[in-house]
């Protein structure tokens, strides 16, 4: 009995090698294997600041439960931030971001100019023309705004001529920015480098990513502050720096509440 069992068991495994590792054709079958290179995700700007990084701390954490998919750190499209649902669709968000960057750059320059003109006036550079607050009224009047106090230099007599010059100059610059030209080829119309970046600020990609975020944030601030300058000028009849100086001199009396009850502008 024992011998027959032994013979049975030995004949069962006779001549078969035990496989330790299966061959690759058995694992994959005869299908083709393709290897795909996934594009590396751009590294967020590694600044020490928690506000300008890609994983920015959401300031309105209480209001917004979940950030939308399109929201980056720069364009926070949370429920609180985009009240008008302007960034609901991804395409609209991209267009709005483009408009925000372009308008923000303009506003940053404009706010600097508005403050600079008032600063120059305060520093006793005898500018005959009014500050930004009253400039529009002065240009529309017949007497014209003499910007550098000399009538022969920049002597804006016709508002239409000013407008025409602005259209030509800005049209030329924008045309170069979109279509390219002698200044260099267009790589990215929103952030054109080359002659538009004389300081070479966008050479390093990490610094460039951080500067983009700072540009949008500071640009929003500048647009809002420019709006504030206009409201201040309408209500108080003074420029932003004069208002600031008055407020610092006497913060209790010279502030927004002093003008809140005054509904006749400029008085």
Curated annotation (Swiss-Prot):
| Residues involved in chlorophyll a 1 binding | 220
Binding-site residues for chlorophyll b 3, renumbered to this chain: 158, 174
Q: How is the cofactor bound?
A: Binds at least 14 chlorophylls (8 Chl-a and 6 Chl-b) and carotenoids such as lutein and neoxanthin.
- Extent of the signal sequence: none
The domain of life is: Eukaryota
Which UniProt key words apply to this protein? Chlorophyll, Chloroplast, Chromophore, Magnesium, Membrane, Metal-binding, Phosphoprotein, Photosynthesis, Photosystem I, Photosystem II, Plastid, Thylakoid, Transit peptide, Transmembrane, Transmembrane helix
Recorded topology in the membrane:
Multi-pass membrane protein
> What does the entry list as the binding residues for chlorophyll a 6?
247, 256
Per the record's keyword annotation, is Magnesium included, yes or no?
Answer: yes
The record's subunit annotation is: The LHC complex consists of chlorophyll a-b binding proteins.
> What is the recorded function of this protein according to its Swiss-Prot or TrEMBL entry?
The light-harvesting complex (LHC) functions as a light receptor, it captures and delivers excitation energy to photosystems with which it is closely associated.
What's the name of the protein? Answer: Chlorophyll a-b binding protein 3A, chloroplastic
Q: Which organism does this record belong to?
A: Solanum lycopersicum
